[in-house]
């Protein structure tokens, strides 16, 4: 991933897609959304603490906007008492927006809700993270984009037709995501 970042460096006023493997696997977001100033900064396996640790290299370029999708790996790794709670994860996501805003207040920040996955045991914590993010939007420098609602089926799990493995998206999933956020991206550019 670092090689790709070096071959496609950030520039001032870019739009940045920031997150984990779900964002990373979207590959060339500039082609998907038809805007040359969009850069992918998704890293497979990344967690909220990881994004916080690498924010400086993104903030330095004062992005026009940042679209953040992060949190599922924090939950996925939550198999021991040492791993973070839904509250910790949501608060880290909110903290990411606050750090961005403190250093580059003109950057528009869009927090995309954590997507559902096929594992039932994560359903309640995903909902809890998303609820905290939505409930705190008015007091923080971000807007919420509710991706969860377009990916969830009637059982509270990811729609099978949008996923390759119950977590990651297939092309139809990426097309669904792009169609949903395109009006927001167009309003920025």
Language model segments and positions:
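Alpha-helical scaffolding within the catalytic cores
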Residues: 50-61, 84, 91-99
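Catalytic His-Asp segment of secreted/periplasmic serine-dependent ester chemistry enzymes
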Residues: 116-189
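Cell-envelope and extracellular/periplasmic
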Residues: 42-46, 67-81, 94, 114, ...
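Active-site segments of SGNH/GDSL-like serine hydrolases
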Residues: 69-75, 98-128
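Charged, glycine-enriched surface loops/patches
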Residues: 87-112, 134-142, 146
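Short glycine-enriched, charge-decorated loop/helix-capping segments at active-site entrances
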Residues: 80-86, 162-164
């Amino acid at each position: 991933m670092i090689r790709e970042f070096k071959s496609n460096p950030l520039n001032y006023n870019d739009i940045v897609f920031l997150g984990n493997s779900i964002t990373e696997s979207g590959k060339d977001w500039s082609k998907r959304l038809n805007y040359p100033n969009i850069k992918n900064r998704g890293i497979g396996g990344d967690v909220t603490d990881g994004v916080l640790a690498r924010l400086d290299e993104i903030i330095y370029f004062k992005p026009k906007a940042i679209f953040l999708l992060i949190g599922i790996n924090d939950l996925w790794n939550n198999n021991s008492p040492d791993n973070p709670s839904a509250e910790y994860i949501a608060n880290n996501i909110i903290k990411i927006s606050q750090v961005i805003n403190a250093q580059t207040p003109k950057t528009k920040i869009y927090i995309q809700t954590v997507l559902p996955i096929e594992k039932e045991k994560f359903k309640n914590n995903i909902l809890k993270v998303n609820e905290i993010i939505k409930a705190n939007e008015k007091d923080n420098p971000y807007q919420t984009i509710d991706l969860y609602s377009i990916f969830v089926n009637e059982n509270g799990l990811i729609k099978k037709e949008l996923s390759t493995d119950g977590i990651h998206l297939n092309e139809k999933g990426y097309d669904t995501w792009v169609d949903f956020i395109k009006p927001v991206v167009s309003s920025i550019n």
